[in-house]
Amino acid sequence: MLKFQSNDTTIIATFEDFILTTYVIIDELYHRFAPSEVRKRRHVLDAKLSDSEIITIALCGELVGIDSENAWFSFVKKNYRHLFPQLCSRSRFNRTRRALMQTTELLRQKLLSDFPVPISPYCIIDSFPLAVCKFGRARYCKVFRNHGADYGKCPSKKETYFGYKVHALITLEGYITAFEITPASTDDREGLRDLVDNCSNFTVLADKGYVGERLMQEMQEQNICLFALKRSNSKENWTKSVRQLIFKQRRRVETVFSQLTGQLNAERVLAKSFQGLCTRLVNKVLAYNLCIALNSIFNEPCELGKIKELIF
């Protein structure tokens, strides 16, 4: 487990401090958990940038909010060359970053289990739309259509879009413990089934999109307690106190999605391929979780979800 001593730094004063802190954590996780076939692959020692440096640059770029990969790479080259003196070409950086997608996702999983942060046994399930193009351009978007993108409806925005849906399982502290991308038309209940597969012994809070007797029975068989808000015409509804509790706790997921879509531009798709889209989403989620973890350690008076106060 990553350990913090009493003489460790407790303040991230500048963005440069944040970059260095991120690198130390990512490098530690990488050398402990990255598969040997990745760490010892051919010509890896000849690379100008290490894998840890590439992941660090990618994560910090997502947090700054510069959604253009070219613009962020140029910014690093101009302002942080002293931190990365052996900066490689932009094309090499992007190819390696995409190739490290599965490794980055593994580091995201290990961060929660290895970082000394509290995680409650209660989770919130929800989803948000991920449109890959404007609605009028949908029929020309063949690249993503070949990878399952289709039409779906977003009730909160009252619109139809073309693309995917991102399902996320979030703790009450705000950590994203699991997520997946599905076609936009996928039922939310299918997303829940996928995310809790091989899991048990925790409680899930959900909205009306996850109502269903069959789903409730399946969750009970996995020792998962599902509290989903009932529809208004339901004969058997939760008590007022339970409904208020679910409403109150579900505000957390709104905050998390607001951070992902606002600060990290999760809904703004500039990727040219499905692999690029998945890579950027994995980077955004890991960057977000890392900020929540650092806030819980360095900025105790600060709310965990206030990631802007950490990096700016």
Which residues are covered by each model-predicted region?
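Short alpha-helical elements
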Residues: 1-312
